[in-house]
Amino acid sequence: MKNTFSWIKKEITRSISLSLMIYIITRTSISNAYPIFAQQGYENPREATGRIVCANCHLANKPVDIEVPQAVLPDTVFEAVVRIPYDRQVKQVLANGKKGGLNVGAVLILPEGFELAPPARISPEMKERIGNPSFQSYRPTKKNILVIGPVPGQKYSEITFPILSPDPATNKDVHFLKYPIYVGGNRGRGQIYPDGSKSNNTVYNATAAGIVSKIIRKEKGGYEITITDASDGRQVVDIIPSGPELLVSEGESIKLDQPLTSNPNVGGFGQGDAEVVLQDPLRVQGLLFFLASVILAQIFLVLKKKQFEKVQLSEMNF
């Protein structure tokens, strides 16, 4: 009886350990793949050259647009609208080799002091325009750099960021100046992972010249292509994942770096910039006072002119 209980206890412990291991592996896999690879490998998403690092993985160049107010007052919430246009009818190759809708993502690089507006400061009208996307800071110490994605492109090809402007009265590092804002936006999956390996959303080239002596279609998708050097019989096997369409056939002579597959990528990355002026309220008040003074001066001038004309008219009648 004691041995039976001991055996049951051992099996339960083994099952719990196995379940925990599977959970950890699965959890790690998900976290490594979602959402922003750039956060894992780069301290700052914008290089000294001005290039945003997302372009290292998303090789195709596509447009992106950003719209912000020309000027904002301190300690106010405004909208930065990022548009990531693409053809809604196209499908991309997913990680499992099947076709699916495109996802989108964006990184917004704000000036120091600007940050994501807290929910309590966002008006109901703005909340309705924003929807319910999940924004996050690029780093806990970099609240001025915001990222989102991947999110469904059908719903979020236009992303509205609620931004809180800083107040120079409380933040001495901020001044009433014109500031640049940078944005990067992608649609679809990348072609290269941060470790340099290829995804299945890109073209695969021959790693050797020779004759395609054998093509094996793998059970779970993809191909093994054996290339034989005609001069010495040396063989090289190129592994093609599920997704790209095969372009070569057995017996075909190929060159080094010749495409073995089509390029399935239908997405791409783009970057842009805009400018916003942090406006001094006193300057605005001064401008309004000046305009009011000009308008009043014009009114008095018109009244004085009419009064003068009346005097002239009365003298002529006299």
UniProtKB/Swiss-Prot annotation:
Cofactor dependency: heme
UniProt binding sites for heme: Y34, C54, C57, H58
Keywords for this protein: Chloroplast, Electron transport, Heme, Iron, Membrane, Metal-binding, Photosynthesis, Plastid, Signal, Thylakoid, Transmembrane, Transmembrane helix, Transport
GO molecular function, one term: electron transfer activity
Membrane topology: Single-pass membrane protein
InterPro entries the record matches: Cyt-f_TM, Cyt_f, Cyt_f_lg_dom, Cyt_f_lg_dom_sf, Rudment_hybrid_motif
Cofactor comment: Binds 1 heme group covalently.
Positions of transmembrane segments: 284-303
Compartment(s): Plastid, Chloroplast thylakoid membrane
One Gene Ontology term from the biological process aspect of the record: photosynthesis
Gene3D superfamilies: 2.40.50.100, Cytochrome f large domain (2.60.40.830), Single helix bin (1.20.5.700)
Annotated signal peptide: 1-33
CC terms in the record's Gene Ontology section: chloroplast thylakoid membrane
Pfam family, one: Apocytochr_F_C
HAMAP family named among the record's database cross-references: Cytb6_f_cytF
Family per record: Belongs to the cytochrome f family.
Subunit structure: The 4 large subunits of the cytochrome b6-f complex are cytochrome b6, subunit IV (17 kDa polypeptide, petD), cytochrome f and the Rieske protein, while the 4 small subunits are PetG, PetL, PetM and PetN. The complex functions as a dimer.
Protein name, as recorded: Cytochrome f
